[in-house]
C-alpha cells in the first residue's frame, strides 16, 4: 500500500481544494485493479457481471469464492432456486447474444449453450456441476477445481475431478485431440465437483489456463440467480457473495486490449506538450494581438499532457502488480478533472466571443456556464467512481449510465453559445453596414460549429462503436482514435482563432470598438464638428484613433 505523505499549503486556495482531495481519497481504493475483490451483501439481482478480461495464450484466471450463501423465504427449498456462474467467450466487446434475453430468462436452465461454460451450484449437496460445451478443451479452456491456493503455473495440468467417474477428460496442452469422456464429444459434458460448506455458506476455488491460440479471446464471468416459481408476490431471494478474482496475461495484469495503453498515453502526452509549446511560441510572437482567452487555450494542452502522463503511470503499475498506486491514481484523477472542466469552459468561452468581442458575458451566457460547469464536475466524479469501483457492485451501473447522460448534456450545452452567435451574426449582417466583416465571422463560426460537432461525433460515437467492433486485442484503437481526435480538435481550434491581424475574429473586435466610440462622440455637442482619423501601422488598424477639428 502506498504511504501517504502529508502536504502543507498556505493561502485561501488550498482550503478550497481540501474537500476535493478528501473526496478523491475516499473514491480511490488501492486494492482495486486487475486483482479484484468484490463483497456483496443481501443482493437481490438476478444477474451480476463480475468481470471481463481479454486473454492471450498462457494467460490465466483464478477465482476464489470465500463465501457464498443464499437467503430464501420460508417454504422455499434450496433446490428450488438455482444459482451459479457462467463463463462466456467472445472475439470482441460486443454484447453476448444469450444475455440479451428478458428478465425472466435464466441461462442456468439451458441444456445447450455454445461458447458458454456453466457452473451450477448445489448448496444442499455441497457440490457444483460444471456444464461445458462440446468445444471445451479445444476452443474453450477447461474449468479446473483445486484446493490449492497457489496461482497456477502456465504448464500446470488441470486438477483431477473429485468424482472418479467424471475424471476421464484431460486437457492436452499440445492441442491434440482430447480423450473421450463418459458423454459424447458432440454433446454437453457435465462434471460434478465437491465443495466446502460451513454454516450454510459454500466456498471453493477454480481456475483456467489459456493453453492454445484458439482459446484466446474476451472472457466474461457472470453470477446468476434463478428464483423459484414457488415464490409469492413480493418475496425475493437474496444472496451474499465474497469473491476474489485474479487474471493475468503472460507479461501483464492488463487485459489484451489494454497492454499498449501506457506507451500510447506517453506518446500522445508528448504530442500535446509539443502543440502547447508551439502555441506559446505563437503567443509570444504576436503579443499585440493576444487576448486572455488565448492564454486559457494555452493551458489546455499542457493540462491534457499531464493527465495522460499520470494515466500512463497509473496503468504501468496496474500492469506490473495488478493494482494502482494510490498517490498516482489521485494525481491522475485531479488532472483529469481539471482538464475536463477547462476544455468545456474554453469551448464555451470561444463560442460566446468572450475577450475577443466582449468583456462581459450576457445573462444567457452565464446560464450556460452555470449548467456546463456543474455537469462537467459531475461527469468527472462519475468517471472516477467507475474507474475505482468493481463492475459487480450495484452502484457501478448507475454511475456508468449517469456518466453517459451527463456527458451528452454537456456536449449539447456547449453548442448553444455558438448557435446564438451564428444567429446574431446573421441578423447583424442584414442590418448594419459591415456585412462583409460579419459574413466573414459568420463563416468562421459555422466552421467552429462543424468542428465541435465532428469532435463530439468522433470521440463519443465513432470511438464508442469502434470499441465494440474491433477484435479484443485491438481495443486500444478506441483510445487512439479518441486522443487523436482531441489533438486534431485542439490544433484546428488554435489555427482558426490564432492571434493574427488578418483574423476576421479579431478584426471585428477592433471595428466594433471604433463603432462604439463614434456613437459616443456624435452624441456630444462639444465634439460636434470633429471627425475621426484612424492611425495605420504595418497595415493593421489600431483600436485607438486621434481626433482633429474641422472648423
From Swiss-Prot:
Q: Where is the composition biased (Polar residues)?
A: 153-164
Q: Which GO molecular function, any one, fits this protein according to its record?
A: clathrin heavy chain binding
Task: Please provide the record's keywords in A-Z order.
Answer: Cell membrane, Disulfide bond, Glycoprotein, Golgi apparatus, Membrane, Receptor, Signal, Transmembrane, Transmembrane helix
Q: What are the glycosylated positions?
A: 64, 209
The record's account of tissue expression is: Widely expressed. Not detected in the duodenum, nor in the exocrine pancreas.
Spell out the post-translational modification annotation for this entry: Cleaved by FURIN to yield two fragments that remain associated via a disulfide bond.
Short name of one Pfam family: GOST_TM
- What compartments host this protein? Cell membrane; Golgi apparatus, trans-Golgi network membrane
Topology in membrane: Multi-pass membrane protein
* Annotated Gene Ontology cellular component terms: clathrin-coated vesicle; early endosome; Golgi apparatus; membrane; nucleoplasm; plasma membrane
Give the transmembrane region(s): 263-283, 293-313, 337-357, 368-388, 402-422, 444-466, 476-495
- Mind listing the GO biological process terms from this record? clathrin-dependent endocytosis
**Chain ranges on the Cytoplasmic side, renumbered to this chain:** 284-292, 358-367, 423-443, 496-551
UniProt-annotated stretches for the region Disordered: 127-183
Instruction: State the superkingdom.
Output: Eukaryota
Write out the function statement from the record. Answer: Has been proposed to act as a receptor for neuronostatin, a peptide derived from the somatostatin/SST precursor. Involved in blood sugar regulation through the induction of glucagon in response to low glucose.
- Per the similarity annotation, which family is this? Belongs to the LU7TM family.
UniProt protein name: Protein GPR107
Give the source species: Rattus norvegicus
Gene expressing this chain: Gpr107
Amino acid at each position: 500500500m502506498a504511504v501517504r505523505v502529508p502536504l502543507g499549503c498556505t493561502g485561501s486556495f488550498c482550503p478550497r481544494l481540501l474537500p476535493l482531495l478528501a473526496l478523491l481519497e475516499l473514491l480511490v481504493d488501492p486494492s482495486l485493479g486487475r486483482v479484484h475483490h468484490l463483497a456483496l451483501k443481501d443482493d437481490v439481482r438476478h444477474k451480476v457481471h463480475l468481470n471481463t478480461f481479454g486473454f492471450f495464450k498462457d494467460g490465466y484466471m483464478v477465482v476464489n469464492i470465500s463465501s457464498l450463501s443464499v437467503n430464501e423465504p420460508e417454504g422455499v427449498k434450496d433446490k428450488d432456486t438455482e444459482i451459479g456462474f457462467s463463463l462466456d467467450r467472445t472475439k470482441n466487446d460486443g454484447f453476448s447474444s444469450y444475455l440479451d434475453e428478458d428478465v425472466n430468462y435464466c441461462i442456468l436452465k439451458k441444456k445447450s449453450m455454445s461458447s458458454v461454460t456453466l457452473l451450477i451450484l448445489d448448496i444442499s449437496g455441497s457440490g457444483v456441476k460444471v456444464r461445458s460445451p462440446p468445444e471445451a478443451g479445444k476452443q474453450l479452456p477447461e474449468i479446473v477445481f483445486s484446493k490449492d491456493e497457489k496461482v497456477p503455473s502456465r504448464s500446470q495440468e488441470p486438477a483431477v475431478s473429485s468424482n472418479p467417474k467424471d475424471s476421464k477428460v484431460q486437457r492436452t496442452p499440445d492441442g491434440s485431440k482430447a480423450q473421450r469422456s463418459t458423454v459424447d464429444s458432440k454433446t454437453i459434458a457435465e462434471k460434478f465437483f465437491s465443495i466446502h460448506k460451513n454454516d450454510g455458506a459454500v466456498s471453493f476455488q477454480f481456475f483456467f489456463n489459456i493453453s492454445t491460440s484458439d482459446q484466446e479471446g474476451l472472457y466474461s464471468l457472470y453470477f446468476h440467480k434463478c428464483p423459484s416459481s414457488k415464490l409469492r408476490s413480493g418475496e425475493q431471494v437474496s444472496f451474499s457473495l465474497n469473491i476474489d478474482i485474479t487474471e493475468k496475461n503472460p507479461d501483464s495484469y492488463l487485459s489484451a486490449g489494454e497492454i499498449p495503453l501506457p506507451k500510447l498515453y506517453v506518446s500522445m502526452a508528448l504530442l500535446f506538450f509539443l502543440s502547447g509549446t508551439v502555441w506559446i511560441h505563437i503567443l509570444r510572437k504576436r503579443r499585440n494581438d493576444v487576448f486572455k482567452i488565448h492564454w486559457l487555450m494555452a493551458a489546455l494542452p499542457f493540462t491534457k499532457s499531464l493527465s495522460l502522463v499520470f494515466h500512463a503511470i497509473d496503468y504501468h503499475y496496474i500492469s506490473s502488480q495488478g493494482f494502482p498506486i494510490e498517490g498516482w491514481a489521485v494525481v491522475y484523477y485531479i488532472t483529469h478533472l481539471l482538464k475536463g472542466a477547462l476544455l468545456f469552459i474554453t469551448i464555451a468561452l470561444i463560442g460566446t466571443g468572450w475577450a475577443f468581442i466582449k468583456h462581459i458575458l450576457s445573462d444567457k451566457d452565464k446560464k450556460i456556464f452555470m449548467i456546463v460547469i456543474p455537469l462537467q464536475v459531475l461527469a468527472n466524479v462519475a468517471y472516477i467512481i467507475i474507474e475505482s469501483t468493481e463492475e459487480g457492485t450495484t452502484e457501478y451501473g448507475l454511475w456508468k449510465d449517469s456518466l453517459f447522460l451527463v456527458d451528452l448534456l454537456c456536449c449539447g450545452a456547449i453548442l448553444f453559445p455558438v448557435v446564438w452567435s451564428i444567429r446574431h451574426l446573421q441578423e447583424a449582417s442584414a442590418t448594419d453596414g459591415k456585412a462583409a466583416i460579419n459574413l466573414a465571422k459568420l463563416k468562421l463560426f459555422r466552421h467552429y460549429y462543424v468542428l465541435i460537432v465532428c469532435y463530439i461525433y468522433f470521440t463519443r460515437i465513432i470511438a464508442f462503436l469502434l470499441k465494440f467492433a474491433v477484435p479484443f486485442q485491438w481495443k486500444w484503437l478506441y483510445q487512439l482514435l479518441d486522443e487523436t481526435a482531441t489533438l486534431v480538435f485542439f490544433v484546428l481550434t488554435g489555427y482558426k482563432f490564432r492571434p493574427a491581424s488578418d483574423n476576421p475574429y479579431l478584426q471585428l473586435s477592433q471595428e466594433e470598438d471604433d463603432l462604439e466610440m463614434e456613437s459616443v462622440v456624435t452624441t456630444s455637442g462639444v465634439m460636434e464638428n470633429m471627425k475621426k482619423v484612424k492611425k495605420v501601422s504595418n497595415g493593421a488598424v489600431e483600436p485607438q484613433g486621434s481626433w482633429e477639428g474641422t472648423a
